[in-house]
């Protein structure tokens, strides 16, 4: 292929004269995106938890949330390392670059970032046609979801990322963009941190119309909220769960979670046809 270049989400330019052949992905969603872009066979390393697609489970592990195994990374001789802007430590990225590795840092904050990242990987991996097709399919599905809920009455939502302590996300998180697609708004959008601990008192003050719990268990955490019967969401029975695996991975599968969230939130509107103002989608 001819020489190509991309600009990562730090603003750093990466140039290549040939497709990357040995790739390490430092986050589960990045591993998945390489497969989506049509280059799963180029992966030589992953971090713990990178379990989708199933083929990824056979890859060598080079670390986890606690840190990276730099000796293992050096031994695998990657010609491209994929890092997650808010999920990998800056010091680790800088150390990899000092070793001479090309590091692409991606930081998805909006639904639109997912197809952009797929296309970017297609450029670097020489799988442009397949990556473009995957990106187009994702955009088409995301657009249909937006149109389905455009103009619906707005619903305020608390997303529970963790129960003890109670952790939620702010308006810059991709989960907030999913909520916007559903015609909803994040009740804690104004938090200064991407993910932060909030108190029960803060939730009582915000009094969201619905609570969405990220969990693989259908009834995870819902019983705990029954201690707060004055919450609108508790009174209305508007406490829902969504697969944490789907909603927290910035890949095409996030739309599976989005479709469930949107349908759950729409059920609140069906119960309260006169509720809130239209969503500004």
Which role fits each region the language model picked out?
Residues 87-98, 210-227:
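A ligand-binding cleft/hinge motif common to bilobed small-molecule-binding domains
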Residues 39, 57-58, 99-100, 182, ...:
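Short, structured coil segments at secondary-structure junctions
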Residues 70-77, 99, 198-207:
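Short helices/loops that flank or line small-molecule/ion binding pockets
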Residues 47, 171-195, 215, 240-241:
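His/Asp/Glu-enriched short active-site or ligand-binding loop at hydrolase and phosphoryl-transfer sites
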Residues 1-22:
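N-terminal hydrophobic or amphipathic helices and topogenic motifs
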Residues 7-11, 62-71, 87, 191-201:
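Short helix-initiation/N-cap motifs at beta->coil->alpha
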Residues 12-13, 79-80, 84, 90-167, ...:
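Extracytoplasmic substrate-binding proteins
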């Amino acid at each position: 292929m001819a020489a190509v270049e991309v600009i990562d989400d730090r603003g750093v330019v990466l140039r290549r004269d040939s497709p990357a052949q040995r790739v390490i992905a430092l986050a589960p969603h990045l591993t998945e995106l390489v497969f989506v872009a049509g280059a799963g066979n180029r992966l030589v390393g992953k971090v713990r938890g990178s379990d989708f697609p199933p083929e990824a489970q056979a890859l060598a592990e080079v670390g986890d949330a606690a840190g990276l195994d730099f000796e293992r990374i050096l031994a695998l001789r990657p010609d491209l390392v994929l890092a997650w802007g808010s999920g990998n430590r800056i010091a680790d990225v800088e150390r990899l670059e000092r070793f001479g590795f090309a590091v692409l840092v991606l930081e998805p904050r909006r639904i639109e970032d997912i197809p952009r990242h797929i296309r970017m990987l297609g450029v670097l991996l020489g799988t442009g046609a397949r990556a473009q097709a995957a990106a187009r399919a994702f955009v088409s599905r995301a657009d249909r979801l937006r149109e389905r809920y455009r103009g619906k009455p707005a619903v305020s939502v608390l997303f529970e990322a963790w129960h003890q302590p109670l952790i939620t996300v702010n308006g810059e998180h991709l989960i907030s963009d999913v909520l916007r697609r559903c015609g909803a708004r994040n009740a804690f959008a104004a938090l200064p941190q991407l993910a932060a601990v909030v108190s029960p008192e803060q939730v009582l003050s915000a009094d969201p119309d619905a609570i969405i719990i990220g969990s693989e268990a259908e009834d995870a955490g819902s019983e705990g909220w029954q201690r707060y019967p004055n919450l609108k969401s508790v009174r209305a029975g508007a406490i829902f769960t969504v697969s944490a695996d789907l909603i927290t991975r910035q890949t095409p599968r996030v739309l599976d979670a989005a479709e469930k969230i949107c349908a759950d939130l729409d059920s609140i509107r069906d119960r309260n046809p006169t509720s809130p103002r239209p969503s500004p989608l």
